[in-house]
Amino acid sequence: MSRIQKTFAALAAQQKKGLIPFITAGDPEPGLTVALMHALVAGGADVIELGVPFSDPMADGPVIQRASERALAQGVSLTQVLQWVREFRQTNTDTPVVLMGYANPIERMGEAAFAAAASAAGVDGVLVVDYPPEECESFAGLMRDHGMDPIFLLAPTSTDARIEAVAKVASGYLYYVSLKGVTGSASIDLDSVAARLPLIKQHANLPVGVGFGIRDAQTARAIGSVADAVVIGSRLVQLLEDTPREQAVTALQSFIAEIRQALDA
């Protein structure tokens, strides 16, 4: 059982919803990343999604694009991101860490080298936004061979064939994008999410985390009423952009604690 599977099994046993926050590695400044990861856990995160900065993040809205640009301007690389995971693991061996990003940095390192390095660092899952599931069997197999879960996105526009393709290669959990468009865009239609998730579960026997458009405790609680987990990203990245750096760790922990409280209410 992977660390992600154990986490979701424990949540189900406690009848709790998962909280999966996203931050961009190296933003707002490289020296804060590990402290921010620990702050997320202290605030009640169950899984951490750590964004690998990339120069052309096509699925991301302006907030996360700016975070990527800030991190890249400070020299953050995939190798550096793995080093931060390794540092985080020195004192936290329980909370799953999922790397989220794009194919280019992985392919530059080499898929096999990346799989070995990520696994050794303590990464639990990898979500590559621009890897189509239909062409991903060897990569997904490589991840699993190294004890990591390959995680995939599904959207309101995903066909049954796409859902089946994802179900064949995915493990850990699925990330359902609740809106068409890029991260951080408009508000969520809860009814359409509630109608869609049972259809996904018919094909894939995996927990489903829902993200894109979750901005506050109220939205998180509403989504938590229909999903296995809530993914929150752009709102956190915006918070870090707007907060003086010396207050970033405290502000992030407080915000996540509010979301946790709403999910558990």
UniProtKB/Swiss-Prot annotation:
Keywords: Amino-acid biosynthesis, Aromatic amino acid biosynthesis, Lyase, Tryptophan biosynthesis
Subunit details: Tetramer of two alpha and two beta chains.
Protein name: Tryptophan synthase alpha chain
Record's function text: The alpha subunit is responsible for the aldol cleavage of indoleglycerol phosphate to indole and glyceraldehyde 3-phosphate.
Annotated source species: Cupriavidus taiwanensis (strain DSM 17343 / BCRC 17206 / CCUG 44338 / CIP 107171 / LMG 19424 / R1) (Ralstonia taiwanensis (strain LMG 19424))
Reaction(s) catalysed by this chain's protein: (1S,2R)-1-C-(indol-3-yl)glycerol 3-phosphate + L-serine = D-glyceraldehyde 3-phosphate + L-tryptophan + H2O
Disulfide bonds: none
GO cellular component assignments: cytosol
Pathway(s) served: Amino-acid biosynthesis; L-tryptophan biosynthesis; L-tryptophan from chorismate: step 5/5
Positions of transmembrane segments: none
EC annotation from Swiss-Prot or TrEMBL: 4.2.1.20
Gene Ontology MF, one: tryptophan synthase activity
Organism ancestry: Bacteria, Pseudomonadati, Pseudomonadota, Betaproteobacteria, Burkholderiales
Catalytic site: E49 (proton acceptor), D60 (proton acceptor)
Similarity annotation: Belongs to the TrpA family.
InterPro entries from the UniProt entry: Aldolase_TIM, RibuloseP-bd_barrel, Trp_synthase_alpha_AS, Trp_synthase_suA
